[in-house]
């Protein structure tokens, strides 16, 4: 059996926070414990949010696994995918990206198809965010036949409604993904596409599809309609070459969600959407998929893992592909040249006369150190007269030699003001009485404002209003969407978001904290 698991981890360090490790990124066994709990031969992670310069050895080298990373080249702490294969499932080839732009011609997979509709610059941009990683494996069927299986670990872009250019980017990425997958399939390899596709395909895959305008007309859903097919569909030019393994085995399963809003606490009531998939070519899904599952009990991210079990065995390669993380120079154990660590530094100009020193001291400092050492040895060898112990009072006497030999003028302190004699007690009392008489009496309004201010400061914040549906204290939120209300605060029900028919879910109470 071959078990594969995919998980949008929302930062590869996130699930490690709950482990007993003071510094998760330096804990040598933390990530292995996470991988072992997933109990899979191949684990595909999305949204790792690490770049190569911050990748540490405990995250890259895990005992019993060989790992492969794709990093974002455009932004730091953004996107990124990684694939961890058990040594018993070592791939025969691995490649970063979908287009071949970052291919190294050493252990790559190939089979790109006709990409003439893309420019080289567009392909580079599509692959520069570290959203796709391919591993190719040898598998053996129950009949003993060896075949090729290519896994495409993918993290598809999210289309921000406020940024229409991101929708274009997302659809072009979808197009590139489909072309590469179909080219691999045409070359004779079985193909699995697994990861976060960032689209809920059908109304059954969304908690509130009825409230979304033109749900089925969404460009991402229409793309999935063309990519996928149903079990009963007959093969043809307009039939998708891939199948959704979960819907193939669980066609009517309700509330099978994989992603929830953290802000609204929707996971408590399972009010989310299914964005994570394990897709396979039709023949592979129908012939070998024994199970397709979700793991909503696994915490640590706003997504839960998804996976599948195939009725095949993996034939491990004798050697890891060149893309394997253990072959990176920083982890390979090879000695690096010192020139890689040397960076020319700009020296600041020496500031002259930062500290005033007597001229005889400056001349003494400018003498070569070698001459000083020579004169010291000479005095010791000649055995000259020893210095007598000085009297303590000599340190408090003015030195005449210093003023004679030094040409430095010492600054003089200017007088602050004329010297005055201290006032008597009667004069102080008289001045105090005059000062009190000259004071302007404080008005009642000013006194009242000051009293109210200190009362509000000492009494603490006002109590939260009660929501209308449950009569429970509300929570305060801040508007973060750009617009006329940006930055304003409001009160809303503190319960998690859920189905409107569920009485334990959030009610529709809303109140601005301050009137506009």
UniProtKB/Swiss-Prot annotation:
UniProt-listed Gene3D superfamilies: Endonuclease/exonuclease/phosphatase (3.60.10.10)
Keyword tags: Cell cycle, Cytoplasm, DNA damage, DNA recombination, DNA repair, DNA-binding, Endonuclease, Exonuclease, Hydrolase, Isopeptide bond, Magnesium, Metal-binding, Mitochondrion, Nuclease, Nucleus, Ubl conjugation, Zinc, Zinc-finger
Protein name, as recorded: DNA-(apurinic or apyrimidinic site) endonuclease 2
Pfam families linked: Exo_endo_phos (PF03372), Zn_ribbon_GRF (PF06839)
Post-translational modification: Ubiquitinated by the CUL9-RBX1 complex. Ubiquitinated by MKRN3 at Lys-370 leading to proteasomal degradation.
Active-site residues annotated for this sequence: 155, 196 (proton donor/acceptor), 303 (proton acceptor)
GO molecular function ontology, one term from the record: zinc ion binding
Residues engaged in binding Mg(2+) 2: 196, 198, 303
Source organism superkingdom: Eukaryota
Deletion consequences: Mice show abnormalities in proliferating haemopoietic organs, such as dyshematopoiesis, defect in lymphopoiesis, and delayed S-phase and G2/M-phase arrest.
Positions bearing the Glycyl lysine isopeptide (Lys-Gly) (interchain with G-Cter in ubiquitin) cross-link: 370
Enzyme class name: hydrolase
Its EC number(s): 3.1.11.2
InterPro entries: AP_endonuc_1 (IPR004808), AP_endonuclease_F1_BS (IPR020847), Endo/exonu/phosph_ase_sf (IPR036691), Endo/exonuclease/phosphatase (IPR005135), Znf_GRF (IPR010666)
Protein family per UniProt: Belongs to the DNA repair enzymes AP/ExoA family.
Stretches the record annotates as Required for the interaction and colocalization with PCNA in nuclear foci in presence of oxidative-induced DNA damaging agents: 389-396
Annotated site residues (Transition state stabilizer) in this chain: 198
Subunit-level organization: Interacts with PCNA. This interaction is increased by misincorporation of uracil in nuclear DNA.
Biased segments, Basic residues type: 367-389
Summary of the function given for this chain in its UniProt record: Functions as a weak apurinic/apyrimidinic (AP) endodeoxyribonuclease in the DNA base excision repair (BER) pathway of DNA lesions induced by oxidative and alkylating agents. Initiates repair of AP sites in DNA by catalyzing hydrolytic incision of the phosphodiester backbone immediately adjacent to the damage, generating a single-strand break with 5'-deoxyribose phosphate and 3'-hydroxyl ends. Also displays double-stranded DNA 3'-5' exonuclease, 3'-phosphodiesterase activities.
Gene Ontology biological process terms, A to Z: DNA recombination; DNA repair
Residue ranges of the region described as Disordered: 357-389
Annotated compartments: Nucleus; Cytoplasm; Mitochondrion
Binding site for Zn(2+): 467, 470, 493, 507
One GO cellular component term: mitochondrion
Activity modulation comment: 3'-5' exonuclease activity is activated by sodium and manganese. 3'-5' exonuclease and 3'-phosphodiesterase activities are stimulated in presence of PCNA.
């Amino acid at each position: 059996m071959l078990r594969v698991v995919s998980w949008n981890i929302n930062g590869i360090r996130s699930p490690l926070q709950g482990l007993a490790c003071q510094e998760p990124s330096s804990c040598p066994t933390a990530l292995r414990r996470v991988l072992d709990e997933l109990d899979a031969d191949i684990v595909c992670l999305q949204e790792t949010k690490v770049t190569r310069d911050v990748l540490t050895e405990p995250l890259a080298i895990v005992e019993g696994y060989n790992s492969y990373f794709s990093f974002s080249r455009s932004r730091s702490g953004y996107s990124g995918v990684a694939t961890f294969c058990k040594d018993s499932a070592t791939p025969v080839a691995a490649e970063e990206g979908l287009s071949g732009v970052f291919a190294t011609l050493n252990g790559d997979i190939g089979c790109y198809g006709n990409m003439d509709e893309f420019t080289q610059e567009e392909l580079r941009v599509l692959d520069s965010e570290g959203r796709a990683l391919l591993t190719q494996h040898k598998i053996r069927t129950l009949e003993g036949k060896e075949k090729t299986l290519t896994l495409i670990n993918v993290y598809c872009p999210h289309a921000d409604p406020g940024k229409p250019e991101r929708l274009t980017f997302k659809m072009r990425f979808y197009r590139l993904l489909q072309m590469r997958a179909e080219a691999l399939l045409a070359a004779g390899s079985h193909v699995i596409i697994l990861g976060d596709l960032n689209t809920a395909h059908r109304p059954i895959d969304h908690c509130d599809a009825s409230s979304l305008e033109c749900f089925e007309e969404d460009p991402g859903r229409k793309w999935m309609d063309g990519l996928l097919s149903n079990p009963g569909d007959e093969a043809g030019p307009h039939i998708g070459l891939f199948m959704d393994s979960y819907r193939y085995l669980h066609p009517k399963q309700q509330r099978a969600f994989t992603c929830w809003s953290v802000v609204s606490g929707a996971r408590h009531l399972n009010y989310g959407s299914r964005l994570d998939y394990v897709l396979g070519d039709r023949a592979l899904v129908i012939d070998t998929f024994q199970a397709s599952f979700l793991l909503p009990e696994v915490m640590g991210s706003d997504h839960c893992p998804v996976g599948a079990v195939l009725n095949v065995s993996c034939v491990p390669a004798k050697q890891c592909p060149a893309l394997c993380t253990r072959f990176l120079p920083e982890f390979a154990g090879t000695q690096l040249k010192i020139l890689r660590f040397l960076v020319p530094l700009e020296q600041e100009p020496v500031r002259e006369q930062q500290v005033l020193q007597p001229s005889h001291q400056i001349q003494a400092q400018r003498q070569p150190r070698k001459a000083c050492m020579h004169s010291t040895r000479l005095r010791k060898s000649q055995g000259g007269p020893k210095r007598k112990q000085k009297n303590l009072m000599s340190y408090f006497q003015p030195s005449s030699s210093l003023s004679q030999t030094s040409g430095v003028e010492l600054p003089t302190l200017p007088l602050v003001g004329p010297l005055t004699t201290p006032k008597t007690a009667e004069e102080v009392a008289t001045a105090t009485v005059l000062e009190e008489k000259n004071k302007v009496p404080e008005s009642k309004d000013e006194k009242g404002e000051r009293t109210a201010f200190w009362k509000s400061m000492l009494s603490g914040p006002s109590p939260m209003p009660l929501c209308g549906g449950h009569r429970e204290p509300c929570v305060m939120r801040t508007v973060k969407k750009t617009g006329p209300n940006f930055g304003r605060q409001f009160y809303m029900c503190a319960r998690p978001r859920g189905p409107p028919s569920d009485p334990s879910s959030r009610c529709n109470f809303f109140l601005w904290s301050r009137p506009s």
